[in-house]
């Protein structure tokens, strides 16, 4: 019986992009199902008292430099040569996160990948409705219709509810994954997830 890997997801996180590709490989190897749960990382930080690593660790001499080294190693290991840090990072992802809630299941997984490519490879501004609509249309979606759907009050509330529910489950950052009730934080935990799925 196929098991599900739930990705607590916000495309504002560079680690969400970096984790995505080896996670897809893991899903293919194990036959698991990938589910994406959109949240707002900023809201999660406010609810937990957490902060982005580059802010939180700035007071520790050498820590951010080492984190950058580890990121480069991860990029090299997984061949993530299309990764580009957007010039406007950090940015608001309210719009793309709401976009993800306009679809479900496999369609949401596909849309998440499209958004990651647009933001982290092509540099499309995540907070620019016109630019996002254009990128979505180019990828085969009805970009204007999807953008319009994000204004549904139910979509807006669902994003808030998802964020609060994730924190209630113990989440404090991105990327977080669940397999059943087992929580894993960080792209470095993908091996542990695969071991659990194989067990």
Predicted regions and their residues:
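Structural alpha/beta surface segment adjacent to cysteine/selenocysteine redox centers
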Residues: 18-119
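C-terminal cap of thioredoxin/glutaredoxin-like
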Residues: 3-6, 10-33, 37, 105, ...
């Amino acid at each position: 019986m196929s098991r599900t890997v739930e990705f607590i997801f916000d495309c504002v996180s560079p680690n969400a992009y970096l984790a995505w590709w080896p996670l897809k490989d893991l899903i293919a190897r194990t036959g698991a199902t990938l589910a994406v749960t959109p949240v707002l990382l900023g809201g999660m930080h406010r609810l937990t008292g957490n902060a982005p690593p580059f802010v939180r660790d700035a007071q520790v001499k050498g820590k951010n430099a080492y984190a950058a080294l580890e990121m480069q190693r991860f990029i090299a290991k997984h061949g993530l040569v299309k990764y580009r840090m957007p010039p406007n990072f950090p940015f608001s992802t309210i719009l793309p996160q709401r976009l993800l809630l306009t679809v479900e299941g496999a369609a949401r997984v596909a849309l998440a990948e499209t958004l990651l490519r647009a933001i982290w490879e092509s540099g499309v501004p995540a907070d620019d409705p016109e630019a996002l609509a254009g990128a979505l249309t180019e990828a085969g979606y009805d970009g204007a219709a999807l953008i319009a759907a994000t204004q549904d009050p139910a979509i807006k509330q669902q994003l808030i509810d998802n964020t609060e529910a994730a924190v209630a489950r113990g989440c404090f950052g991105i990327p977080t994954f669940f397999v059943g009730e087992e929580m894993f934080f960080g792209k470095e935990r993908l091996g542990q997830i695969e071991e659990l799925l194989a067990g």
